[in-house]
């Protein structure tokens, strides 16, 4: 510890302990950062991001992921390719996110644009998960139906917080990267806790029991809808709904025709689609193959929780070092690293790690940390870019549209990965061609580099759409619309309304 003596004006001196000062900065730095965001963006926005992303999606999502994998494998007893294809279906509600966005923007219920949808999302989530957890011998497709309903509940809650981030990114462009860092850190910390508990909980209460526990994060969503402050919209004419839907559709189509919008959107879809998802094949090999590690449930959860540290490191690295770099350069290097990181899975499948004296447990922990860190670094600049592509007036709906394109890419990736596992005959008991699936996936991850010309070269803090696309209003229109915007976006600022 270093101690320095500094002179005071009155001739005295004070001892400054640098070690303690640095430690205080490390501890107080994040607190000051959160206070700054709360001051600039309103405390309820920060609270909403932490609640929905940290608890509902981070903690609840990670628990649900592990529970779903074991539920499909041990309860429904499906093949890995079938499991991957079926679970991808549950993501369909995320593809139609623009519908939820339009509903919350233009269709108030009992005079409120946001509160009823939060309450509805929470109720749907609680009911669907209770049905899965309490029903014995539930048919596969009925279970899939209720999983899709719970996914829809999470998507409805998510779309409101989405719009808030998009709106604030436009009003505070210098804080766009900070907002994405907050979202990522909340999600990563929640996932860290969720994955850490997931294996233990699956072992203690089973996958169906975990579904029952997941009702609590959804109950929190309903509580958020009950307690947050939102201005009441008096005398709303429901005859306007059809016209507002039409206007929103025209505005989205007009914006999508702009090359500054459709080009990066196309790149995001291609990048996600070509990164073939073969997770279920690897998961079955980790847990069931005699030639594999044969990990227990607790071990799987612990490995995934440690892997979440990679996401936290990525969010921290992005916030401190990478948030000011150009979009195209970041996409180039993260995509290259993403392809190279997949080779770790190939080393594991060939069991080369054992030849170098590295046990499976240690190697997979390193693999998971590296994979999640690079995956998060690859994703964050795309999120920032997405938030900056949203025009005024339809921030929530258009952000939902762009994110639905990304979710469509993820679903396509899962389906293509499932098809590849099926073609290569990777089953519950046969894993002879799993190495080939991993190799093909790694090569496919390089192909998006051919489409980097679609990504803008601009800096993350200064990039913006042309004014004619952003839809700036005249002075009279601003005065006329200010009240309406305050009503429709107050929940974005005064509660937990959009990401």
Swiss-Prot record:
Alphabetized SUPFAM superfamilies for the sequence: MFS general substrate transporter
Q: Which residues cross the membrane?
A: 43-63, 92-112, 116-136, 141-161, 185-205, 209-229, 266-286, 302-322, 330-350, 354-374, 399-419, 435-455
- Give its localization: Membrane
Topology of the protein relative to the lipid bilayer = Multi-pass membrane protein
Print the keywords alphabetically.
Membrane, Transmembrane, Transmembrane helix, Transport
Q: Which GO terms describe its cellular component?
A: membrane
- Entry's NCBIfam families? fbt (TIGR00788)
**Function, in words:** Could mediate folate transport.
Q: Which family does it belong to?
A: Belongs to the major facilitator superfamily. Folate-biopterin transporter (TC 2.A.71) family.
Q: Which PANTHER family match?
A: FOLATE-BIOPTERIN TRANSPORTER 1, CHLOROPLASTIC, FOLATE-BIOPTERIN TRANSPORTER 2-RELATED
Q: What is this protein called?
A: Probable folate-biopterin transporter 2
